[in-house]
Amino acid sequence: MRDLILNALLAHYEGQIKMAKANVEIFLENAAGVGEHNDILETIDVEIAKIADAEDKIDVVLKHLKIANPRI
């Protein structure tokens, strides 16, 4: 059960990274088409912060919590 929960967290963090990466790619490819985002640099910075946060959480789980079979 423990590994199931920790792997679910890891999958959640990986999903957050993928979503943020997709958003960055969309903003980079079609910045003009995203009308509600006036400051594209700030918007991309927010997405990069989401990636950094999720990566930090993955690192903490892998470093500090023993997990038999991490699925990442």
Which ranges hold each PLM region?
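Extended, charge-rich alpha-helical interface modules
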Residues: 1-72
